Amino acid sequence: MMRIQSNTDPRIVLLRNKEVVQWLFGDLSFLPPIEKKNKTVDNQKYKILEDEWGRRITHMRRPDLKLDKQWTTKFGEHICEELCLLQGKTFSKPAKKINYQPDCESDDAILEVKTETFFTEGTAGEKILGCPFKYAEIPSLYQKPLRILCLGGAEKACREQYGNLEGEKCSPQKRAFLDFFKANGIEYVAVTDILKSLL
């Protein structure tokens, strides 16, 4: 993470933390060990540990926030901002247009951030697949392409289950949909791909 280490911008907080970078790449080995029982119980324990870690880490960047339950939204938005800074881009909260309030606007794109923990169960992440339809008007409203940034468990699910990011699950049929979205100014982006480009 050479570019991160050499960047002196004090607004880059989360991405300087080794555990954050590990988490983004799906390495949760920094979590404390648990007494193993079975997969269901173990995942419940890991979910608690992951949430405790996430709230603590997010609090480092935003000590003003009360993070009783949900931490992934703010965490993801701040990762997005820090990535913009590392790429030399300016960012801001975009103006609300019609009923849209995207997460971030950079020099060259509107950014919507989708973050999920690695131990979230169920189908909550499947909402990510509806983003191109939900936000179809954003590229024309803002005159910029929409990039849907997927990070953490969301990136893993998109790559390994849903196939809307590059990987074995991205079939030719799914690729055709992704090409259509891109032709209409909407693209899914894996945060780890951005991080790798910054090495």
Features from the language model and the residues they span:
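Domain-level recognition of nuclease-like catalytic cores that cleave nucleotide substrates
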Residues: 147-199
